[in-house]
């Protein structure tokens, strides 16, 4: 698992995909800390798995998964400068990121 992953190079994306690394995207934390916006749509189109997280209280003033999902959608629209996003970033795509069973299962095994 890779947390945040805001500035991945094409080589990084290749390595992540080759080794099955998935990204945990924390949009509220990234906004709160002014870290930037991860190009989630590009990562999904490249075949990477992306989950949504809320990060911790030190870098986020609330732990609200629905707010994180909503902000992820809005930030991806802003960075794409386009309201209709790809199927990866529509409401169902964002819900899949929030509830990816394969990834959740691997986290449970690691804990």
Give a label for each model feature.
Residues 41-111:
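His/Asp/Glu-enriched, well-ordered alpha-helical/loop segment
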Residues 1-62, 80:
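Active-site core of metal-dependent hydrolases
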């Amino acid at each position: 698992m890779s947390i945040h992953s805001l500035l991945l190079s094409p080589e990084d994306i290749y390595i992540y995909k080759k080794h099955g690394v998935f990204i945990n995207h924390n949009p509220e934390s990234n906004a709160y800390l002014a870290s930037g916006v991860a190009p989630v749509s590009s990562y999904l189109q490249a075949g990477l798995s992306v989950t949504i997280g809320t990060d911790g209280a030190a870098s986020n003033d609330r732990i609200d998964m629905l707010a994180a999902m909503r902000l992820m959608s809005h930030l991806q629209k802003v960075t794409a400068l386009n309201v209709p996003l790809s199927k990866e970033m529509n409401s169902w795509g964002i819900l899949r990121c929030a509830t990816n069973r394969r990834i959740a299962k691997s986290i449970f095994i690691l804990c």
